[in-house]
Amino acid sequence: MSNFKKSPVIFDEAAHTYTLEGARLSGVTAIVKWMFPDTYKDIPQSVLEKAAEHGSLIHKKCEQYDNCGFGDDLQEVREYVRLKAENGLTTLENEYLVDDGKDIASSIDVVFDKDESGMYSLADIKTTSKIHKDNVTLQLSIYAYLFERCNKGKKVGRLFVIWLPKEQYGKAELMELKRIGSADCKKIVKAYVAKEDATPYREKYFGGVEASTEIELIEESMPANLKDAEDEIIKIETQLKQMEERKKELKEGLYDLMVQHNVKKWQSKRLQII
């Protein structure tokens, strides 16, 4: 358990809203969308909603594992555990709520314990089919600014995106990102609150063109009906594999019984084993 400051902001998980003394605050993801409005513009809403549901499940499972030591029944969570272990990262907080006291608030996915330099690391979990580095760099940099504002004297050293994709889109990876300074983050937040045009800020801090990993965006470019078909096929293939394994186990069990009782042939109306 950490000794971080507890935010007075009230987070409504169902409505995904942040409220401070009756006033509604914006989330950091809204600032990211303002800065990069075209990231998901061509993706059907149904695909985005399905991806969001999957992402929420993985987030909750990772948090469950950190807090209770179980929940690693999914491959993505096992990869999360592996990445933490391989990089010597210890979770202090999940979904740690931070705010600027007036306009914005958000929950940081993971806060890791201090490193050798005495600074904390922040991480955001992504389950998308590829990583939009500029988007998550902005997101985590604002998180770092808010974290340090809420916890005077405590410093953030490293920012990580924990990429936990479905198996067909690549291997899970821990990516370190370069931080945008707090002074610049304050300027960006101020411009967002004032409803300024994001273009000058996007050009200044990101060169006007979004950078991403080289992973092909297969999932997001698929029409919803094809994506649904793909998911169903993968589900069926998994079930078939499981049933074949179970069939093998049962037949081996029957064969062992036949040997024990000196039965050379088993035959019924539905099954024959020799």
Model-inferred region functions:
Residues 1-105, 113, 252:
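Metal-dependent nuclease catalytic cores that hydrolyze phosphodiester bonds in DNA/RNA
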Residues 45, 49, 134, 220-223, ...:
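Short, solvent-exposed segments of well-ordered alpha helices
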Residues 47, 127-130, 237:
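Surface-exposed cleft-lining segments at the edges of enzyme active sites
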Residues 54, 58, 136-139, 246:
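Hydrophobic (often cysteine-bearing) scaffold residues that line and stabilize catalytic clefts
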Residues 72, 96-193:
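Nucleic-acid nuclease catalytic cores
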Residues 81, 234-274:
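Extended, charge-rich alpha-helical segments
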Residues 189-245:
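Short, charged, low-complexity amphipathic alpha-helix
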